[in-house]
Amino acid sequence: MRMTNVTKGKAAVVLIVEDDREMLSLLCDEFWSAEYRLRQARDGDEAFQMVLQSVPDLILTDLRMPAGGADYISRLRTVAPGCPIIVMTAFGDARCKSDVLKAGANAYFDKPVRVAELKQCVHDLLANTSGDADKAAS
């Protein structure tokens, strides 16, 4: 099992990747708690560099942004194989969802996101610290 902050009894590190300032602010407000330590990135390249430096316990990311897309999810998966990845997008369809899940995402949400469902998904994936729980939501 991958040692994470969760398995060590510490606050989980969640990397939130979002290029829209309002959405980033909303997500940070929703996940701000003693339970999570938040890190932020504004695009796929910045997120990738941050993950190279230190793998978070979970990545919550937009899909359609600079340096985003299914290839971005594949790149993240190669450097963080056990880290749960949740993808959100406002421009998805069934094929997009399939491509993203095949690329290595653990969960997929269409925007606008139902915050309660997103929080439950984050909680569930962090509870399974191996990151192997494939769960898809829409």
Where are the regions a protein language model picked out?
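The short loop immediately C-terminal to the conserved phospho-acceptor aspartate in CheY-like receiver
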Residues: 59, 63-66, 91
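Non-catalytic signal-transmission and effector/linker regions of two-component phosphorelay proteins
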Residues: 1-15, 116-138
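Alpha4 helix (beta4-alpha4-beta5 surface) of REC/receiver domains from two-component response regulators
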Residues: 71, 92-109, 120
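Two-component signal transduction core modules
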Residues: 59, 85, 108-109
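Short amphipathic alpha-helix used as the core "switch/output" element in two-component signaling
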Residues: 49, 70-81
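Two-component/phosphorelay signaling modules centered on CheY-like receiver
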Residues: 20-39
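Acidic, metal-coordinating helix/loop segments flanking the phosphotransfer/catalytic sites
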Residues: 40-58
